Each structure stands twice: as structure tokens, then as C-alpha cells.
Amino acid sequence: KNISAMHMVSDHFTDANKDIFILKRQTDASNNTQQLSLDGNSPLATNTPPLAADSVAFASATIFGQEASNNTYVYAAKFDLVITTTAGGIPTVASDRKIIVRNNPPGQETWNVVPAAIQISAAPYLTFQVSSVTSSSTVKWIGNLELTVVT
């Protein structure tokens, strides 16, 4: 089946759930900083992993970027995050651990990934900002995000 997210809820309590998301985006010389989404487009309420107001969330992610025409040039990072969200829906990355698994962009280019706890229409969401400081590379980014939200 073709899905980009999976939602799990416990039989024993209703204030927590776990979701698994596949995220995508592309960067190039003209658009060198982007945010990942479920459909590879700009983050909207319908295509971005949601958080919840007045909650804590635990996230684990692997984000991978590869030059579109040469699989030698890659960037890979793993993240463990704790995100807190106020009753008003303002999310904050309270704790993060980033492990760069591979950092091999071409020449003098710089590629990077950072977590982004954002609001869309006053609701909290989690995504990742990907960047490639480049004059010529097109980088395809993909991410695997596991997100547990407790309200």
C-alpha cells in the first residue's frame, strides 16, 4: 500500500500516540534552504507532522541527502529530540542530539539539517530544515521520522 505516514494509539491510555512519517524535499542553487514535508512541497497543515498543544513529544529521525546526478555526494544525520509545546501551541525543541553519519558534499559546498518546531495557522508541527549552499548541486532529501506525542 502506498502510504507516507502510520498512526498508532495505545489500548491502555489515550493521551499518547506514535506516528511514523516519510518526509521529502529538494534543494538547489535557487532554493538552497527548504523544510521537509510529506509530499515534498512547502509545509502546510495537511502535509507536515503534527504536534499537539500542551504536550511533550519524543522524536527520532534519520535524514539523508544525495546529489541528484552523483550518489558519491551524500549527507546523513540521525536525531533524537524532545519537543515541548505550550497550551497556546508554541513548540520548542527542548533537547536535541544530532549525529552526523556522513558529510560528503562536493567541493566547497556545505549541506546541513536542523530540526524545526514550527507553527502553521497557530498549530504546532515538527519538520526539518535542509540546506545546501551550492552553485550547481541539486540535492534530494528524504527523512524517516518516528514521533511520539503525549498530551
Question: Predicted segment positions?
Answer:
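Edge beta-strands of jelly-roll/beta-sandwich modules across compartments, strongly enriched
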Residues: 137-145
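Structural motif
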Residues: 1-17
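Surface-exposed ligand/attachment interfaces on beta-rich extracellular proteins
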Residues: 13-56, 64-75, 86-96, 103-138, ...
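Compact beta-sheet-dominated globular domain cores
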Residues: 77-81
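Short beta-strand-to-coil "C-cap" segments at the C-terminal boundary of structured domains/repeats
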Residues: 145-151
